[in-house]
Amino acid sequence: MRNPIPRVAAIHDLAGFARTSLTAAIPILSSMGIQATPLPTAILSTQTVGYNDFTLLDLTDDMVRILDHWERLGLRFDGVYSGFMASTAQMDSAARCIRNCLAPGGLAVVDPVLGDDGKLIPTMTPEMVAKMRWLITCADLITPNFTEVCLLLDEPYSPEADLPTLKGWLRRLARQWYIPLPGVFHAMQRKL
């Protein structure tokens, strides 16, 4: 029997001092009547943007054990949402969750958390950017910001890109995914 309350596996970090990640996702999903089921990637003292000396507890190994348990239970989710990843191995776990725990007809959403304002998040590496390009192929919907669009397409960060360039980038991404890009639309509006 199908659970009448929609369930979403939320694969993200838990930041102690922040208004982001699981701290935001759980109450937002809950307020929408969705059962948020966290699969934490890391525990951080603060969010990564704006703080240089944050602490990070990597939960890569725990993610594997949690997924093993969920699979033994036969859990299925109406949606799988992934955000901040602390390692490339975590991206493998996120793909595994999409592949093995997403109910037929469910929605896979990947927020490719890589950077902002033209800079990588301090914990990100070129290898993680390359792996994120692979992870987004598992998604139905991706939610990159402008910096992440540039990183995913291996294009130089150019906040002054002209309208034809921005449209071309969006077309390249939109061949495979639905992409709500508020930051890009604001940049495009400035060009109109």
Where are these regions (language model features)?
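Conserved N-terminal subdomain of the carbohydrate kinase-like
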Residues: 2-110, 114-122
